[in-house]
Amino acid sequence: MYKASKRSKENLKGVDSRLVLLVGYALAISKVDFVVVEGLRSTERQKKLYREKKSKCDGVTNISKHQEGKAIDVYYVGWKNTDSSKDDRWRKLISTFKFTGKKLNLKLEFGYDWGWDNPHIELK
C-alpha cells in the first residue's frame, strides 16, 4: 500500500475533492507507486503550455480541465522521459485508476486512451 507523497499532496491543492479521493483510493490498491505531478493550473501556466505546444487548450478561449481543478497528471515513480509510452507500468497504473473510478462511481476520461497524454486523468 502506497501513501500520498508531500509533492502529491501539494499538487492536489485546489483540485476537485472527488479526484483527491480517487488518488487516495488508487494509492491504497495500486501495484505501481505514483505521484501527482500537476493538478490545478493557473491561466498563465496554461498559456505557456499552449505556446510550447504541450497542450491543445490556450487557457483563454479554450479552458483546460486543469484550470477548473477537474484534472490531474500522474506519473509512476521512476518514470523517465526516455521510457516508452507503451511501458507496462502505464497500463497497470491506468487500470488501477479506472477500477477505482468505477468503484467511486466517477465518470473519468483518460489521456492514455487518447494515445498521446498518458499522465492525464479528468472528470467528465
Language-model-derived ranges and their functions:
Residues 16-19, 53-58:
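Short amphipathic alpha-helical surface micro-motifs
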Residues 9-13, 44-53, 96-98:
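Short linear motifs at secondary-structure transitions and domain/linker junctions
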Residues 1-35:
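Active-site acidic/histidine clusters and adjacent loop/turn architecture
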Residues 56-124:
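Catalytic cores and adjacent binding grooves of peptidoglycan-active enzymes
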Residues 25-56, 103, 107:
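Extended, low-complexity, intrinsically disordered C-terminal regulatory tails
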Residues 9-17, 40, 84-91:
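Soluble non-cytosolic domains of exported or imported proteins
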